């Protein structure tokens, strides 16, 4: 398994997906910077302690990172089949189940890594203004959010791949998925079942009751179960080709 994960990571050196992800992260930082320091008239919201860190995290989760993660995940899972090298791999032979699981682990690493890169960039800005008042809890918010968003978008990745659709559709689906969060988030306690709202809840972005946290955990578990079923079907389908 470790060899397969390492192999998948080495394949990324030939991929432009990392550049796409970097562009998306830069856009998030630019937009939040403009909003926090230039769009508030006489009041610069970015000067408030931890405003920039929480603004980058919330804007990224609502509009950019789910789409980036979904696009990346769909690309690396269906890359072999769309580039017509899957049949060659099956001649080696390769354990398709382990290969798909290795790809999923790489997606998890990418999701968490993307959030950590975003955190470090935002943290550097905050350090310039509020080094004395920053707390460790904000790092936890980013870390948990990265893990939860991975589980939230994994069903989209698996569904797009299992249906043999173009991986760019996962970007579109994830963006719609993210946009709906704006409206679902106002529905009260029941909104915690929506995966991206659940991600905000579990990371501590929202103040939540034990019942809301429980609903968020259930949401993540359901995402994991649905993804597990799709991954199993995907590995069996590819093994029969």
Language-model-derived ranges and their functions:
Residues 1-25, 162-165:
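Aromatic- and glycine-rich beta-strand/loop motifs that create alpha-glucan
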Residues 20-25, 164-182:
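Pore- or pathway-lining transmembrane helices of multi-pass membrane proteins that form conduits
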Residues 76-108:
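Helix-loop-helix units of permease transmembrane domains in multi-pass membrane transporters
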Residues 26-69, 101-167, 203-207, 211, ...:
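Secretory targeting signals
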Residues 67-81, 157-168, 223-236:
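Transmembrane alpha-helical segments in integral membrane proteins
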Residues 77, 86-89, 121, 125, ...:
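Hydrophobic alpha-helical interface/terminus motif in multipass membrane transporters
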Residues 34-53, 171-241:
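Terminal transmembrane helical anchor/hairpin motif
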């Amino acid at each position: 398994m470790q060899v397969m994960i390492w192999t998948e990571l080495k394949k990324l050196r030939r991929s432009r997906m990392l550049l796409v992800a970097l562009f998306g992260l830069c856009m998030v930082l630019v937009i939040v910077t403009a909003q926090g320091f230039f769009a508030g008239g006489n009041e610069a919201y970015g000067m408030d302690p931890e405003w920039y860190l929480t603004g980058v995290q919330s804007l990224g989760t609502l509009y950019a990172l789910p789409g980036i993660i979904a696009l990346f995940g769909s690309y690396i899972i269906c890359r072999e089949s769309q580039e017509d090298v899957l049949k060659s791999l099956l001649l080696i032979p390769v354990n398709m189940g382990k290969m798909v699981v290795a790809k999923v682990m790489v997606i998890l690493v990418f999701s968490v890594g993307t959030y950590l890169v975003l955190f470090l960039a935002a943290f550097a800005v905050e350090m310039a203004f509020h080094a004395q008042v920053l707390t460790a809890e904000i790092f936890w918010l980013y870390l948990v959010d990265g893990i939860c968003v991975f589980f939230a978008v994994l069903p989209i990745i698996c569904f797009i791949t299992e249906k043999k659709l173009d991986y760019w559709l996962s970007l579109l689906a994830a963006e719609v998925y993210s946009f709906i969060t704006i409206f679902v988030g106002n529905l009260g306690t029941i909104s915690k079942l929506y995966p991206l709202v659940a991600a905000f809840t579990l990371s501590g972005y929202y103040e939540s009751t034990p019942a809301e946290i429980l609903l968020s955990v259930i949401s993540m578990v359901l995402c994991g179960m649905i993804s597990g079923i799709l991954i199993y079907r995907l590995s069996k389908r590819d093994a029969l080709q």
